[in-house]
């Protein structure tokens, strides 16, 4: 069903404000009542309650009793209005008050009504109470003359904030009926919008007009405030323009000005949270938007809103990168071999292990990283490239302690190094040649580099009886080593297991030469095809790179090569004469293999050779 608006037809050069609709339940009841009592009026108007009020006012003009009650209530209203005006002038207002020029025949009246919970309240309310509730009285007018229940006279200047008048109705009656009364301006019985010209807003609200800002502060450093827009009547706009503006406002957010102020003067005011259904029928300028301001850790304010929020007003916090938290429980150390007697005590075993570890780590240590049991050697890779992240299972990550490689090279040249002149460096000399103690002058001329290599540089530990004050220019500093204590037990640290590269390498392919093929054929003719170890000892005893398996494989290759045509043969060529001998020996030993195994091989090789000649096999 389409609701027909009747505001445009009553327009006399200005637009009426939109009246908020009642809930659907109340509107449904009003519709049913109007259909039952008035069959002629079939159209539904949005301001039925305002029309009902007009009818009641017309009835009040004809009734003298109602006019008398009206005069009594008027006097009470005038007294209340004076007290309110005096209080408002003393307190002041944070929002500027615009000035309006109003003729002497104009007065300000409350004439916009809120809907009650049901229409039964209005039906049971007498005329005098109805006028008393809705405040159909003038506020502080001069030249008081009663005419049709209204006062005529010149209204005072600055009657309210933004053209609004303070409600002077009795609060007890309003509370009893549960009604709310929005304010508007009535001029001569007709509603008019206040003039928006020559308005002087406050400086703190330069970009927001004449608004009211209320707020409340909680104990948890959260600030809640809602910004109530003023009830200014806008100029008339066609439904098409309103529909376009509504669609545009839903697609794009509006920018919140940077100099937006948050006033906390009214601390005791509660924030108003509206639901969607309660805002039904309101225009965009009548809605109250609730803003929420909280403090972020970096002391910057973040503004959020229940109505509309500017995307530029939210400060994004910097995103922290993902960190990897490691919990190292143990380190792996290289394997150590320690020899101790069975009669040794546990304390001596501990000392021995401690000494072994000290010797291992005396030259410095370095940390190794193991991932899935494999050592990570590239130190320039990132943790994510290596596979170390907070999402992965860090149980596959390990660390090792390794001795740092020796950085001091062993000088094997015979050139004389520079003699240090600092006396402190002389005490750090670790060893000297045995010839230094023999008293032979110029002993360094006797030392040869070849002798040093052959003797593996047996160095004597540093002797404490050598005088530091009398340095000898003939001595040579070979390798600086720290002072070692000689122990009875030998400690041999094992750094790494040696890699056997020679076993891991693939064997080099060595093809048989013609001489080796001839020796193989001759040995097979004499010994047969089932004694390959004897063939190895007979013909290839000195050839370590030839095994009996190699000889057997080569014999099979020769038999296959001799049985095919010369065009199909591959590899190094073999003389045809040798291939013919291979075929004759293969045929002979294949026929007599069982008979020779039963009789046993003869110890004399010349007899076997003679048997081969008798069978027609040529050597």
Curated annotation (Swiss-Prot):
Tissue: Expressed ubiquitously. Highest expression in flowers and roots.
Keywords of the record: DNA-binding, Nucleus, Transcription, Transcription regulation
GO cellular component, one term: nucleus
Signal peptide limits: none
Ranges annotated as spanning the membrane: none
GO MF, any single term: DNA binding, bending
Superkingdom to which the source organism belongs: Eukaryota
Family annotation (InterPro entries): Homeodomain-like_sf, Myb_dom, SANT/Myb, TRP_plant, Ubiquitin-like_domsf
Keyword Nucleus found: yes
Domain HTH myb-type, first and last residues per copy: 504-563
Residue segments, region Disordered: 593-619
Annotated region of DNA binding: 532-559
Domain spans labelled Ubiquitin-like: 324-403
Pfam families associated with the record: Ubiquitin_TPR1
SMART domains: SANT (SM00717)
Main location: nucleus
Subcellular localization: Nucleus
Function field: Binds specifically to the plant telomeric double-stranded DNA sequences. At least 2 repeats of telomeric sequences are required for binding. Induces DNA bending.
Subunit organization: Homodimer and heterodimer with TRP1.
PANTHER family: TELOMERE REPEAT-BINDING PROTEIN 3, TELOMERIC REPEAT BINDING PROTEIN
Protein name as it appears in the record: Telomere repeat-binding protein 3
Annotated gene: TRP3
């Amino acid at each position: 069903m389409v609701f027909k608006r009747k505001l445009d037809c009553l327009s006399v050069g200005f637009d009426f404000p939109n009246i908020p609709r009642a809930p659907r339940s109340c509107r449904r009841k009003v519709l049913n009542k109007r259909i039952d009592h008035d069959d002629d009026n079939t159209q539904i108007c949005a301001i039925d309650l305002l029309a009902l009020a007009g009818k009641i006012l017309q009835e009040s003009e004809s009734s003298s009793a109602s006019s008398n009650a009206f005069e009594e209530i008027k006097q009470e209203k005038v007294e209340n209005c004076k007290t309110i005006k005096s209080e408002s002038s003393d307190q002041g207002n944070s929002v500027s008050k615009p000035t309006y020029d109003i003729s002497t025949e104009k007065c300000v009246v409350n004439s916009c009504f809120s809907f009650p919970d049901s229409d039964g309240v209005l039906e049971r309310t007498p005329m005098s109470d109805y006028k008393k509730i809705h405040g159909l009285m003038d506020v502080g007018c001069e030249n008081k003359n009663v005419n049709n229940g209204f006062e005529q006279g010149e209204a005072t200047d600055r009657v309210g904030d933004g053209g609004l008048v303070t409600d002077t109705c009795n609060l007890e009656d309003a509370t009893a009926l549960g009604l709310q009364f929005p304010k508007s301006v009535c001029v001569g019985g007709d509603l008019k919008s206040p003039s928006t010209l020559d308005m002087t807003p406050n400086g703190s609200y330069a970009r927001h007009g004449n608004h009211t800002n209320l707020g409340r502060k909680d104990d948890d450093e959260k600030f809640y405030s809602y910004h109530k827009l003023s009830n200014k009547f806008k100029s008339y706009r066609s439904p098409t323009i309103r529909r376009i503006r509504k669609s545009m406002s839903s697609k794009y957010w509006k920018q919140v000005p940077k100099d937006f102020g948050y006033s906390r003067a009214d601390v005791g005011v509660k924030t108003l949270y509206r639901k969607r259904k309660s805002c039904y029928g309101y225009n965009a300028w009548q809605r109250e938007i609730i803003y929420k301001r909280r403090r972020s850790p970096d002391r910057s304010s973040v503004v959020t809103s229940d109505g509309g929020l500017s995307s530029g007003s939210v400060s994004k916090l910097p995103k922290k990168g993902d960190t990897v938290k490691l919990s190292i429980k143990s380190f792996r150390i290289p394997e150590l071999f320690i020899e101790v007697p069975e009669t040794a005590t546990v304390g001596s075993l501990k000392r021995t292990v401690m000494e072994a570890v000290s010797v291992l780590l005396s030259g410095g240590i370095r940390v190794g990283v193991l991932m899935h049991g494999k050592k990570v050697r590239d130190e320039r890779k990132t943790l994510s490239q290596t596979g170390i992240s907070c999402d992965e299972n860090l149980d596959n990550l390990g660390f090792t302690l390794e001795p740092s490689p020796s950085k001091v090279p062993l000088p094997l040249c015979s050139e004389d190094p520079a003699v240090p002149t600092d006396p402190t460096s002389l005490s750090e000399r670790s060893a000297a040649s045995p010839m230094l103690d023999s008293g032979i002058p110029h002993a360094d001329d006797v030392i040869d580099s070849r002798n040093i290599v052959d003797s593996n540089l047996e160095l004597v530990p540093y002797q404490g009886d050598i005088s530091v004050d009398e340095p000898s220019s003939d001595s040579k500093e070979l390798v600086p080593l720290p002072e070692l204590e000689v122990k009875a037990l030998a400690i041999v640290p094992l750094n790494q297991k040696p890699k056997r590269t020679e076993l891991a390498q693939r064997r080099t392919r060595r093809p048989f030469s013609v001489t080796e093929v001839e020796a193989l054929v001759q040995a097979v003719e004499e010994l047969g095809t089932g004694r390959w170890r004897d063939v190895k000892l007979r013909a290839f005893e000195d050839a370590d790179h030839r095994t009996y398996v190699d000889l057997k494989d080569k014999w099979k290759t020769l038999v296959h090569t001799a049985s095919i045509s010369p065009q199909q043969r591959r590899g190094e060529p073999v003389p045809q004469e040798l291939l013919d001998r291979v075929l004759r020996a293969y045929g002979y030993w294949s026929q007599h293999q069982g008979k020779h195994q039963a009789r046993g091989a003869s110890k004399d090789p010349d007899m076997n050779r003679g048997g081969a000649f008798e069978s027609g096999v040529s050597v």
